[in-house]
Amino acid sequence: MESPPQSQAGLARHLHGVLAELHRQPYPHVPNPPACKKRAAVALILRIRPTYDHWPSSSSTGDSSSSLSTEQRLEEFFAQPWVQHGEPEVLFIKRASRVGDRWTGHVALPGGKRDPEDADDRAAAIREASEEIGLDLTTNDCISVGNLPERVVTTSWGSVP
């Protein structure tokens, strides 16, 4: 079997390492300041696009057992030849264009404001991805690895000093 080009094989290997490290070393939770009641969350959704020369077999379509640990699921996924030859992609959305909306037309990660019924930021990101793009991130073919760095974002949009 032919080995993948160095750039693709290296990229998949490095992506595997980064995701495994993100899972092992999650970023700490950053609480909201007392005066800030709103909170938002986004989902960084990555996929590996197979190349035409290395298409996945029908048995490698994400049937990974949910009883495996995240590390095992990552190891199993990145061990597949089509993944090693594939091209990583990030999902971005383009927000709707609306008059008066400060985010109008922006390119962004799927996500949005946390609702009271959301248990945590992860739940908010999962719900928002489902609402915005119809992608269910709770299925077995999705591997939830960890959280991105949290930060407090403040704005004076529309306020008068």
Language model features with spans:
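N-terminal leader/linker segments that precede catalytic domains of diphosphate-processing enzymes
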Residues: 1-161
